[in-house]
């Protein structure tokens, strides 16, 4: 139920998107990201706003709490489900949630990282989320994360 409410909030925050332009503005992208962050941060009280800001800036610590916070965001983005990378849904979400200027670079990075979670166990440390985000950070020039 909370996820459906979040999707409605994200859709409202994005506003109408003209059919001729599939992407969103950077402002809309960051607004949607803030909503995700606002849902996931309270679930992981050991992850401070400062740590979340550092993750957004590409400094990705490897600890259970930060990995599970990252997992929460990636699940909301439909990029990971139960520790497994969801290539098709990630590509669909990318087309909806990123400005057009980001898409080619992200499509390449996503395809390079599609196997980064293979063989990793999700419980108890959310390791696949850390592996996926680290791979994306290393393979995408303009890294963005809420």
From Swiss-Prot:
Give the protein's recorded name. General odorant-binding protein 19a
Q: Please spell out the taxonomic lineage of the organism that makes this protein.
A: Eukaryota, Metazoa, Ecdysozoa, Arthropoda, Hexapoda
Provide the tissue specificity. Answer: Expressed in adult olfactory system. Expressed exclusively in a subset of chemosensory sensilla on the third antennal segment.
The signal peptide stretch is 1-22
Annotated function: Present in the aqueous fluid surrounding olfactory sensory dendrites and are thought to aid in the capture and transport of hydrophobic odorants into and through this fluid.
Question: Where in the chain are disulfide-linked cysteines found?
Answer: 40-72, 68-126, 113-135
Key words of the record: Disulfide bond, Olfaction, Secreted, Sensory transduction, Signal, Transport
Q: What's this protein's family per the entry?
A: Belongs to the PBP/GOBP family.
UniProt xrefs under InterPro entries: PBP/GOBP, PBP_GOBP_sf
Q: Name one GO biological process term.
A: sensory perception of smell
Cell compartments where the protein resides: Secreted
Q: What organism is the protein native to?
A: Drosophila melanogaster (Fruit fly)
The answer on whether this UniProt entry bears the keyword Cell inner membrane reads: no
One cellular-component annotation, GO: extracellular region
């Amino acid at each position: 139920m909370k996820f459906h409410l979040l999707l409605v909030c994200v859709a409202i925050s994005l506003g109408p998107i003209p059919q001729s332009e599939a992407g969103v503005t950077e402002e809309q992208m960051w607004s949607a990201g803030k909503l995700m962050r606002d849902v996931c941060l309270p679930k992981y009280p050991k992850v401070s706003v400062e740590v979340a800001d550092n993750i957004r800036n590409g400094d990705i610590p490897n600890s259970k709490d930060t990995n599970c916070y990252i997992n929460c965001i990636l699940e909301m983005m439909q990029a990971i489900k139960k520790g497994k990378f969801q290539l098709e849904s990630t590509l669909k979400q990318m087309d909806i949630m990123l400005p057009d200027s980001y898409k080619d670079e992200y499509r390449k990075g996503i395809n390079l990282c599609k196997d980064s979670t293979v063989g990793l166990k999700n419980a108890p440390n959310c390791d696949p989320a850390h592996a996926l985000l680290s791979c994306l950070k290393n393979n995408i020039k303009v890294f963005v994360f809420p």
